[in-house]
Amino acid sequence: MTCTVLVGGGWGDEGKGKCITYLCYNDKPSIIARAGVGPNAGHSVEFRGDKYGLRLTPSGFFHEDARLLIGAGVLVDPEVFLHEMEYLSKYSVADRTGVDYRCAIIERKHKEQDQSSSYLSKKIGSTGTGCGPANAERVMRTAKLAREVEELGDFLTDVPLEVNEALDEGEDVFVEGSQGFGLSLYYGTYPYVTSKDTTASTAAADVGIGPTRVDEVIAVFKSYITRVGEGPFPTEISQEEAEEMGLEEYGTVTGRRRRIGLFDMEMARESCMINGATQIAVTCVDRLYPECERVREYSDLSAEVKRFIEDIESATGVPVTIISTGPSLEDTIDLRDELL
């Protein structure tokens, strides 16, 4: 039995989708549970030549023997959720997905409030998906819950019960966090943050898992840092510099251009400390070091990349166990058997 929690170490967009895809395909957990804020975060998943953009469904959906769950701490937009059930019908996702009956619901009024607020949309850089206003209503104890939405009736379940029974029976459980450490309401670059905490402890709580049941915490970092929207960014470089390096990205949900910066060792250290990381995954190594594109053995990485990996381990005190060198599952160096 292993309970693994995966979280973003930066400001989101770290490549969590690729890591989740790889880990769930190889480790085949019985349950894949989605934690995090809600549909304001997008995970990009590429599997067998097809690309998917997800906002609520767990990114490990392609593992067709897994039960897919959305924890009580996650805000659910019924329109987004039901669209994804249809969108992913090829994988029989609707037959395998459960939504905790205590999830708070994002209503149209929440999206309108989010989008009409100049403070949220312009100063803070909100995605406009209604998460902040919906979470505010939950705090005020006025939010509608999933059990009150007829269209969700067939999907309702008790997520903590399912997850803990699976752990009791010796099954593997994988918890997907969303966004990243730098966007945490408590530990991020306040006020330029999301509407709740994004660390591993909260991700576990989102799905009803107590801290003593978590075995592994994987913090995901991109080999360079990106950020969508406003807020401090100590290692940011200009768009011109980013373009010269071949780094140009756009957000999955908003379509906004991502700001680019160099890897931030201090942020990585703090992120690993507060998340209690036991492992680190480093993604997009091929983007920063093209000579390492699709390399699949650690010994074949360039000396420069090896030094970079060693510097991360030295700064954080956490082993780098997963290195992504390309978009496909095969473009992954997995060092877990050697280091753990």
UniProtKB/Swiss-Prot annotation:
IMP binds at residues 13-16, 40-43, 127, 141, 179, 194, 256. GO terms for molecular function: adenylosuccinate synthase activity; GTP binding; magnesium ion binding. The active site is at 13 (proton acceptor), 43 (proton donor). PROSITE patterns: ADENYLOSUCCIN_SYN_1. It is found in: Cytoplasm. Substrate binds at residues 252-258. Pathway: Purine metabolism; AMP biosynthesis via de novo pathway; AMP from IMP: step 1/2. Its cofactor is Mg(2+). GTP binds at residues 12-18, 42-44, 258, 284-286, 324-326. Binds 1 Mg(2+) ion per subunit. Its EC number is 6.3.4.4. Mg(2+) binds at residues 13, 42. GO terms for cellular component: cytoplasm. Homodimer. Belongs to the adenylosuccinate synthetase family. This is Adenylosuccinate synthetase. It comes from Methanothermobacter thermautotrophicus (strain ATCC 29096 / DSM 1053 / JCM 10044 / NBRC 100330 / Delta H) (Methanobacterium thermoautotrophicum). The lineage of its organism: Archaea, Methanobacteriati, Methanobacteriota, Methanomada group, Methanobacteria.
